[in-house]
């Protein structure tokens, strides 16, 4: 029975360490890993005849905060549906820091995200997680990446801080830089989308295009 209980708990974003003892006991203790992989990658497949990737880029939705704009997120989905766009790149801080006061209590913020982030069966979100998104892990030991991977398959997490999306022979980096973060993947791509800054700009930098 303990394995079933542990699996149920792990599905909600918690992890456990197995401690083995010479008397044959196995003791399970909560494990908080702050050094979660900073970089990950995923392959976004396209047909051979399709030469153009159409996507929308968003960032810093801070769901659960007093200033959240779920209406604009719904507008984004409606725009994608009307234009036949099936991919959204989300550059992090999808939720607000659970230590911050907000319209939703801190312990309910992750469930609020799961229930209120829009869904359409034809739209995928590729998400790099930011400094606000790591707050459930730091405060409760609850990994948002695990939760989204288990309960929202349309919200594809590709790492904390940065992640790499391979598209045919090219690579796209989503980045949300913060202090406890080492940037490596952005050296592998000509296109980098940044979150965290809360303003829009385009910059050419050493043959890279940064947004």
Regions found by a protein language model. Name each.
Residues 1, 171-211:
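Conserved beta-sheet core of the metallophosphoesterase superfamily
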Residues 1-57:
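Acidic, histidine-bearing metal-coordination/catalytic regions of metal-dependent phosphoesterases
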Residues 41-43, 63-157:
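Core catalytic region of metal-dependent phosphoesterases/phosphodiesterases
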Residues 44-56, 164-173, 206-208:
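Beta-strand-turn-beta hairpins that frame and shape the catalytic cleft
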Residues 48-51, 80-84, 119-122, 166-167, ...:
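Flexible, charged surface loops at secondary-structure boundaries
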Residues 55-57, 87-90, 127, 173, ...:
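Residue-level marker for buried hydrophobic side chains located in beta-strands
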Residues 60, 92-93, 130, 176, ...:
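Active-site glycine-centered loops adjacent to acidic/histidine catalytic or metal-binding residues
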Residues 156-166:
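Short acidic low-complexity segments
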């Amino acid at each position: 029975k303990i394995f079933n209980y542990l699996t149920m708990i792990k599905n909600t974003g918690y992890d456990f360490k197995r401690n083995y003892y010479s008397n044959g006991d196995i003791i399970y203790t909560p494990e908080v890993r702050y050094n979660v992989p900073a970089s990950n990658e995923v392959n976004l497949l396209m047909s051979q005849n399709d030469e153009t990737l159409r996507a929308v880029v968003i960032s810093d939705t801070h769901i659960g905060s007093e200033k959240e704009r779920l209406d604009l997120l719904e507008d984004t989905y409606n725009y994608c549906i009307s234009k036949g766009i099936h991919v959204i790149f989300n550059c992090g801080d999808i939720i607000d820091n659970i230590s911050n006061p907000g319209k939703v209590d801190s312990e309910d913020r992750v469930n609020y995200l799961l229930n209120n982030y829009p869904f359409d069966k034809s739209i995928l979100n590729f998400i790099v997680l930011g400094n606000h998104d790591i707050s459930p892990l730091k405060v409760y030991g609850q990994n948002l990446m695990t939760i989204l991977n288990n309960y929202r398959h349309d919200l594809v997490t590709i790492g904390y801080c940065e992640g790499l999306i391979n598209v045919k022979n090219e690579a796209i980096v989503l980045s949300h830089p913060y202090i406890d973060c080492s940037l490596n993947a952005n050296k592998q791509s000509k296109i980098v989308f940044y979150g965290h800054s809360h303003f829009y700009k385009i910059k050419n930098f050493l043959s890279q295009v940064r947004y």
